[in-house]
Amino acid sequence: MGKLGKKARKFAKKNLQSVEKRSRKLKPFIKKKFAKRNERHQAGDKQEKKVEQQPKKRCQEEEFQDIAIDAVFGKDDDEVLRDGDSDSDGYLDELVNETDSDIMKCKVLSRSFLATCCDMVDKEQYVPALVRLLNWYRAACQYGHEPSGIARPNIYYDIEDSETFAKVIIFVLQKADHTFRSILGLSDSSTKEKILKLKNNPKWDSLKPLVKSFFRSTLHLVKQAGDLEIISFTLTQLRVSIVFLAAFPDLLKKLIKISVHLWVTGEETISQQAFLILKDISMVFNSECFDSCLINMYKAFLHDCDIPKANSEQRPFLRDSLVELCSQDVQKSYTKASVSITQLAKLLKMALATKNKEAVEKIHSGEYINCVDLWVNFISANVQDCDLQPLLYTIVQVINGVAQLIIGPRYLLLRVKCIHWLNHLSRTSGIFIPIASLVLDMLEYKTTNDGEKQEQKLEAVSTVKLPKNWLKSQNFQEQCIFSVIELLAVHFAQWSFHISFPDLATIPVMRLKKFHERSTMEGLKRVVKRFIEQVESNIEFVQRKRDDVTFSPNDQQSADTFMQLEKQNANAPYTQYYQSIIDKALGTNKKKKK
């Protein structure tokens, strides 16, 4: 068939539907087929980017679930190496330096034989007698935790009675350190460097297994003993010999792990003794063990804070002792604190952005709140002696964010705690931190007085979120206003003699006057009125002094020395008023504890 003419093609294009349909199908195919290769690649890349960008928000939400406050320092350092730390070594070989042929076959410790061995060790540092004592000491420490009978081939270790049992433990704990040092010729002030140099001492080769046996048995006793007095006595005696652990790094790690556990979970005396051991370890071994002690204590502290307890009076001690350890090496602790506070800020930022229920609960958890409390106290303890301004700025931003995350009367306690933190940081650093707006917002809480009167004080409530029945109680607003007065009194007391005090106190006084006018509770009105009168009196006092000055407002040095003499006067009216409020608060706390 020949080619159609021009007129025929024109007719077909206009009138035949099949031709139009086919051309429409082929047109995009032809364009795609002959498109430039680079353009096709670019189009593909754009599509891939769109696919990748879609779940971005979802990834952020999932990322929040993976953030843990106690995971910022990496893995635990509390795993103990098993080589040389297991109990498979058994008892010491009693043939060391022994030429006697009549070695006891039955190893039963009697009172008379114990007295003989103790006398030989105490006066002569006789090594074979020390070996026997350490074997019986090990048997006593392992009592009830290993099968009775033959512990080694053809050798049986046993103790005659309970009195002998107690004496062998007490004697070894009291005399072992002195005996080791006497044999090696070491003084009581020997450092870990001297212990490490003992490798070249021939006496050390024969004494090292004895020292190791003593520590292994003692650590087992501390870990397994159920009597608090035995544990306390053992920890006290163990502190003297810590320097010897330089030769046994595995046992040193095990001691850190056991001490951290006792520090967190032990009774008050045990907890204090365990902390002293951790403190001594970090001082004796410096950088080698400071990080390990700090990280393990930090994680144990946060884990304990996340567990609800009926009695949480020990937590201030745990916090203060951890702050004390951090203060031993502020430079290293600064790095850890910076990482931890940054993590707190990330969690808060996510919670503020999403207002997700789980995110808010994370911020209000005991772990988060106590972590903030820890670093607030660390900064306050060291801000005068060290440059901690970056940490101070960041933690203040975090505290302000926590206070404003959810505003409402049920979160009154959390807001009060946040303001206490800010007042504490301001007082210790000498830097002005505004808190008036956070305090005065508490005046606007709408409450009713329909419920029963609560006998419990606000400070005694352990939860962050108040129960609903508290909001309807008769004295909730009363306790709320008392908190406002106390917080403002502390804030004003710091700046009561500053040249800018009239400007600082004017707006809070105006807000308090409005509250005084609309309040119908006479008891509250009297308290608020007295506070207003005291503040206004101090405003007038500072204003009169300020009117007499001759220096410029730009003269910062003169402004800082303003009213320094008056500041030292404890009889100033506002100072006395502030002291009465503090005394009243302290008296309330004492009654609560009783």
From Swiss-Prot:
Give start-end ranges for motif Nuclear localization signal 3.
512-519
Q: Which GO terms describe its biological process?
A: floral meristem determinacy
Disulfide pairs here are none
Region (Disordered) residue spans: 1-21, 35-58
Q: Which UniProt keywords apply?
A: Nucleus
Q: Where is this motif: Nuclear localization signal 1?
A: 8-15
Q: Where is the motif Nuclear localization signal 2 annotated in this sequence?
A: 35-42
Q: Please give the annotated consequence of changing residue 8 to T.
A: In rbl-1; indeterminate flowers in crc-1 background
**Effect of loss of the gene:** Plants lacking both CRC and RBL exhibit strong floral meristem (FM) indeterminacy with reiterations of extra floral whorls in the center of the flower associated with reduced AGAMOUS and SUPERMAN levels.
Tissue expression as described in the entry:
Expressed at low levels in roots, shoots, leaves, stems, inflorescences, flowers and siliques, with highest levels dividing tissues.
Keyword Cytoplasm on entry: no
Q: Look up the record and report any one GO term of the cellular component aspect.
A: nucleolus
- Renumbered to this chain, the Basic residues biased-composition regions fall at 1-13
Per UniProt, subunit arrangement is:
Interacts with SWA2, NOC2 and NOC3 in both the nucleolus and nucleoplasm. Binds to ENAP1 and OBE1.
Q: What does this protein do?
A: Collaboratively with CYP40/SQN and ULT1, influences floral meristem (FM) determinacy in an AGAMOUS and SUPERMAN-dependent manner, thus contributing to the floral developmental homeostasis.
An additional note in the Swiss-Prot or TrEMBL entry is:
'Rebelote' means once again in French.
User: Which family does this protein fall into?
Assistant: Belongs to the NOC2 family.
User: Under which name does UniProt file this protein?
Assistant: Protein REBELOTE
